[in-house]
Amino acid sequence: MAKPSLSAPPLSLRRDKNKETFRTVKIRIVWIGKTREPAIASLTEEYLTRIARYVQVEGVAVRDEQDLLAKSGHSKKAGSKSTLVLLDSSGKEFSSEQFAKFLGDHQDRNPLPLTFAIGGADGFSPAAKAAAHSLISMGKMTLAHELARVVLLEQIYRAFTILKGHPYHSGH
């Protein structure tokens, strides 16, 4: 079920137009369940490829919440090996610019990989929410979990284009 990892040169080796340098931390997106729609699979791969231009990224499909926590580096035996962010309707909402700042701050201050997790149709258990470092929401509307994945991936890509001063975001 696991997807291959896509790599990019570290942001620390790149400079943006303001000559700022960025340190890179791996980003992992983990979701529950197989992708049923070919269009969703195609968009997932497209955005993983785009994100890989800026940072090492990995997309991983898992069977259930227990596998999700293990793949994200949050097992009882191993402890915490990543910063876990769950997509949840009760989470904090961000504008695209605020989300870019959130990612940039993590890149600058935290050496652990950043794992975004998307639950299944029933969301996350209280135990998973307690294990998370933060909860974020894609908005007040409810999205199908496969669609939420594509929206998250697009926003991660958009965040890196904002951080790098790329014109992708300027059309808003």
What are these regions (language model features)?
Residues S5-S7, S12:
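Serine residues within intrinsically disordered or low-complexity segments
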Residues T35, S89-K92, G120-G123:
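Short glycine-rich anion-binding loops that position phosphate/pyrophosphate groups of nucleotides
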Residues D16-N18:
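Intrinsic-disorder-associated, low-complexity terminal segments enriched in Asp/Asn/His/Tyr and depleted
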Residues E20-Y47, I51:
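N-terminal beta1-alpha1 ligand-phosphate binding loop
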Residues P126-H172:
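Structured adenosyl-cofactor binding patch, chiefly the S-adenosyl-L-methionine
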Residues I29, V85, G119, L152:
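Conserved RecA-like P-loop NTPase ATPase core
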Residues A52-T115:
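S-adenosyl-L-methionine/SAH cofactor-binding core of RNA-modifying enzymes
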